[in-house]
Amino acid sequence: NRLVERAAKYGIKRYLYLNEPRAMGEEYFDGSPQRMSYAGSKLGDLYSFCSSNPEVLAWLSRSMEGLFSKVDGLGGVFTITASENHTSCASRNYRDCSLCSKREYSDLIADVNRAIELGVHRASPDAKVIVWDWGWPDDKCEKIINQLPKECWFMTVSEWMQRIERGGVPVSLWEYSMSVEAPSARAKRNWEYARRAGLKTVAKVQVNATWEMAIVPSIPVLDLVARHATNLLEQDVDGVMLSWSLGGYPSENLKLFQSFDGKMSADEAVEKLAREEYGEKAGALVREARRECSKGFEAYPFHIFVIYNGPHHIGPSNLFYMTPTNYKATMVGI
């Protein structure tokens, strides 16, 4: 409650990221026939909570209702229902569940989101329930979206599945990128599905930094940021989520993106900001530098192993060897 109140002083609402119902270890279910009836598919030593069991969905709704009843002023939630964490049976190995294996995958994902929406809005009708399609199989998106409550907002990452070729290497993006043209055909398609289903739409973006270069507070590629903003205006999305696990620094990137209203071209907007921030003489030089940075960044050698395992996040602390070691780099952030 204190965090909600502090944020409210500045006109900010707090949202919760929900990755529920979270799987539990065997010890949670052992010795309790009732709890064991909630268990679904198994991954390692974790059992999912089976969303084909009505009691699990009712518990999920009650939990959301209780949370939003006790924390007045929460802005809402956004959900991940098919992530790398084991949650419902549909998040992993649902074919191993005796109940879920008989049902459509799209029904299972929609059920969890419906249960969350029901509980949130019973306690707080004005709170937003944003449903993110992270991890949904591409051929299931339309069916899931069509089953979501009309009160939900649908969110997808703007650049996902954008196809590019850098240095002769073809890549289909499954990560955030500031070096590519966005939104992708997949994002446009899923937003259109959502509009047809009567849902509001959200673009999930990172305009400050990505794993392409996470060591800096922001990447000075403002031409690319402005171009992305222009493209999203053309898509007429209802909202944006501006950062995620990195990229929250209050930079000129964020200032440019948030203020972009389409009344001037991308080039004009970047130039105007440079002159406002640095004056006429220095602003012209800054503008040219940003143009060159943006141009160069479009040649970034984007590949998932580069951005996750490359040495560029570590900088001078990265060790050098005179001979090959055959060591495999640890994933960034671990």
Residue ranges and their predicted role:
Residues 1, 42-51, 91-106, 171-181:
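Glycine-rich tight-turn/loop motif centered on a GG-T
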Residues 1, 22-44, 88-100, 145-153, ...:
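Aromatic- and acidic-residue-enriched segments that line the glycan-binding/catalytic groove
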Residues 1-10, 26-31, 42, 52-59, ...:
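Aromatic- and glycine-enriched glycan-recognition loops and surfaces
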Residues 2-16, 48-81, 111-119, 232-235, ...:
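An active-site-proximal structural segment forming one wall of the substrate-binding cleft
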Residues 15-66, 200-202, 222-230:
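Active-site-adjacent "subsite" loops/lids of carbohydrate-active enzymes
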Residues 18-23, 80-84, 135, 243-246:
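Short, solvent-exposed turn/loop segments enriched in Gly/Ser/Thr/Pro and often Arg
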Residues 20, 45, 60-102, 297, ...:
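Active-site groove signature of glycoside hydrolases
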Residues 69, 102-334:
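Substrate-binding groove of N-acetylhexosamine-processing glycoside hydrolases
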